[in-house]
Amino acid sequence: MAKSPETELPLKAFGWAARDTSGTLSPFHFSRRENGDDDVSVKILYCGVCHSDLHTLKNDWGFTTYPVVPGHEIVGVVTKVGINVKKFRVGDNVGVGVIVESCQTCENCNQDLEQYCPKPVFTYNSPYKGTRTYGGYSDFVVVHQRYVVQFPDNLPLDAGAPLLCAGITVYSPMKYYGMTEPGKHLGVAGLGGLGHVAIKFGKAFGLKVTVISTSPNKETEAIDKLGADSFLVSKDPEKMKAAMGTMDYIIDTISAAHSLMPLLGLLKLNGKLVTVGLPSKPLELSVFPLVAGRKLIGGSNIGGMKETQEMLDFCGKHNITADIELIKMHEINTAMERLHKADVKYRFVIDVANSFSSL
């Protein structure tokens, strides 16, 4: 007879879980492992709400196992360390992102590319040693030290939480594909959780940044608040035509199905388009503009642990955080409804510790 999530491991834990494809979250008692020799135990203070949390809750990608406790933008304080842990101490502010385990022996792991390990264990909804992982919509987590990162002292913990997914998701491809040369022109397609952080990275790298959006009412915010240099309404044919061949790079953060062809037209010769938005349906693409303009389309999946630490340190140096709306856990279902409607500027973050302190 299978054990229940509440009793299968030694440590009692509490969070909010969805039980079915309605995606509705409610209180959930489960259990976590004891802190091992290489582990770090973290009391969760804040957890960002990622669009992939919503996809997983609804089983949009077809691999959700219920009950599921989402959350992979975790910031908290260390409460216990194993005897082999030298990098972290009790009381440190730390982060836990999208992955909590990998094989640690393959070529990718040996190159600090754990996110491309063929056997990754994600922070939630992954099988792991006979049980499943549960994420950061909960009171604490136990993680192998390799998958924990130090949080810079000058970054606010709540507004820094989304950097652990949204931040590294745009930082890693910008670095890998060389989209960092000062003075070059970066297009940011989509102004949401990923896009607004991409603007900030672009400006920190010294790029000219243009936001590409279907929503003209976002222009003032993009330029005056987030620091973009210009704004391009993608459903305005005349403005799109005038902007053709003007951009060196585009990072496409759009999570809805859309055609890549208009974006390719904006690129110069040798331009690079990198997509990170994970639409649930295939995107329209013709190879002709790639061949004719020697253009590149690429993708990227979060970042390895070494690069995630590098990204956080970069954010600390340049005072980069996410723009957030702080919520309590009991508000999470309303937040998910709003996220589905893109009604957030620009990332929800759950005040986990204060949500559970009265329980």
Swiss-Prot record:
Family note: Belongs to the zinc-containing alcohol dehydrogenase family.
Cofactor note: Binds 2 Zn(2+) ions per subunit.
One GO biological process term: lignin biosynthetic process
Residues reported to bind Zn(2+) 1: 50, 72, 165
Function as written in the Swiss-Prot or TrEMBL entry: Oxidizes mannitol to mannose. Provides the initial step by which translocated mannitol is committed to central metabolism and, by regulating mannitol pool size, is important in regulating salt tolerance at the cellular level.
CDD domains reported for this sequence: CAD1
Keyword set includes NAD: yes
Gene Ontology MF term list: mannitol dehydrogenase activity; zinc ion binding
InterPro entries registered for this protein in UniProt: ADH-like_C, ADH-like_N, ADH_Zn_CS, CAD-like, GroES-like_sf, NAD(P)-bd_dom_sf, PKS_ER
Catalytic activity, EC: 1.1.1.255
Needed cofactors: Zn(2+)
Protein name as catalogued: Probable mannitol dehydrogenase
Keywords for the protein's UniProt record, in alphabetical order: Metal-binding, NAD, Oxidoreductase, Zinc
Gene assigned in the entry: CAD1
Matching PANTHER family: ALDEHYDE REDUCTASE
Enzyme class: oxidoreductase
Superkingdom per UniProt: Eukaryota
Catalysed reaction, written as an equation: D-mannitol + NAD(+) = D-mannose + NADH + H(+)
Signal peptide: none
Covalent S-S links between cysteines: none
Binding site for Zn(2+) 2: 103, 106, 109, 117
